[in-house]
Amino acid sequence: MKKSGVLFLLGIILLVLIGVQGTPVVRKGRCSCISTNQGTIHLQSLKDLKQFAPSPSCEKIEIIATLKNGVQTCLNPDSADVKELIKKWEKQVSQKKKQKNGKKHQKKKVLKVRKSQRSRQKKTT
């Protein structure tokens, strides 16, 4: 009798813990940015720029800039300067991606040319 009672209680506890484990805890007002930087940030000093959309844990848009010296600062998403900085950053990132893809494409062309030159050399000998 005692064993069945203990097993029953363990089963109930297990079911409760499984239900609790998957439940997300929603906390309103837990934003990463408490205040925003009022100064100007230059594109050359940026290492990374991340934008976070409103979520259940934070109701406002957050923009966090990581500078080349490692300092992270929050930017005001409503500022005209910040909006311009975001446009320039996105343009710079897309240009870097294009350059990177272009270099890969050029390497493939060089390899193809070298292979075709080798096959021509084999045919002539």
From Swiss-Prot:
Disulfide bonds join C31-C58, C33-C74. Residues 93-125 are annotated as: Disordered. Induction: By IFNG/IFN-gamma. The induction is enhanced by TNF in dermal fibroblasts and vein endothelial cells. Residues 1-22 form the signal peptide. It is found in: Secreted. The keyword Nucleotide-binding does not apply. Its main location: secreted. Residues 94-125 have a biased composition (Basic residues). The keyword Amino-acid biosynthesis does not apply. Keywords: Cytokine, Disulfide bond, Inflammatory response, Secreted, Signal. It comes from the Eukaryota. InterPro entries: Chemokine_b/g/d, Chemokine_CXC, Chemokine_CXC_CS, Chemokine_IL8-like_dom, CXC_Chemokine_domain, Interleukin_8-like_sf. GO terms for molecular function: chemokine activity; CXCR chemokine receptor binding; CXCR3 chemokine receptor binding; cytokine activity. GO terms for biological process: adenylate cyclase-activating G protein-coupled receptor signaling pathway; cell-cell signaling; cellular defense response; cellular response to lipopolysaccharide; chemokine-mediated signaling pathway; chemotaxis; defense response; defense response to virus. GO terms for cellular component: external side of plasma membrane; extracellular region; extracellular space. PANTHER family: C-X-C MOTIF CHEMOKINE 9, SMALL INDUCIBLE CYTOKINE A. Belongs to the intercrine alpha (chemokine CxC) family. Cytokine that affects the growth, movement, or activation state of cells that participate in immune and inflammatory response. Chemotactic for activated T-cells. Binds to CXCR3. This is C-X-C motif chemokine 9. The lineage of its organism: Eukaryota, Metazoa, Chordata, Craniata, Vertebrata.
